[in-house]
Amino acid sequence: MLLDHILKPRAVAVVGASTRPHTIGNDLLKRLLEYGFKGHIYPVNPKGGEIEGLRAYTSVNELPDGVDLAVIVVNAKFVLSTVDACAALGIKGLVVISAGFKETGGEGRQLEEALAAKVRANGMRMVGPNCLGVVNTNPNVRLDACFAESLPVAGDIGFVSQSGALGGGILNILKDLNVGFAQFISIGNQADVNAETALEYWENDPDVKQILLYMESIPDPANFRKLATRISKKKPIVALKAGRSAAGACLLYTSDAAD
């Protein structure tokens, strides 16, 4: 289905996994392990060896078949070649945590355009770049590929946020209130997957019974309105659109590249 490779993967590769504590590449790997992901986990680090008790593969090309999702945390200049390697292996789901794209302007914008084109050309789906990651609390999945401060308790809400900071803040607040989530998607620069993609996916996902959206830009307002009108007849939707003032829009552009 639309986002199954990302939200319900059977195997996850962490490209840019690290042995160094308190780095994103190490924290993400540990969170996958500690949350009890039900599938296989493959760290990728050019030095190889072992990371958090798992064999580290020196490149994506070394990975076994059957990887659904690659969580990419390498430097932005290496992301395109990493995506090429993922495509060659048949990996269809990508979460690009790495920053350094449209939010930096100029060359970063061009790099993101090339990234999005490569994803489309290979029939892949991508969350990000410049995002916190994704979570699925379903006990048969147990996916925590996210570096938000708080992990939501299990529930029936699907939550998508363009802002990493605000998304993480909402998770903190609602965790304190014991409000549970089924799935969380931090879309970041939304070069591919956006709020509309999430709405379409969650429309028929039995795990998600309520939908919460925080958006700073809507690429196709007419299509969003059409989707939201249709889906809200089945599941309640709460949507917050920020950045309405000129000052707010400027601030949002520098944080998550909202257009």
What does each model-found stretch correspond to?
Residues 1-255:
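Catalytic-core regions of core metabolic enzymes
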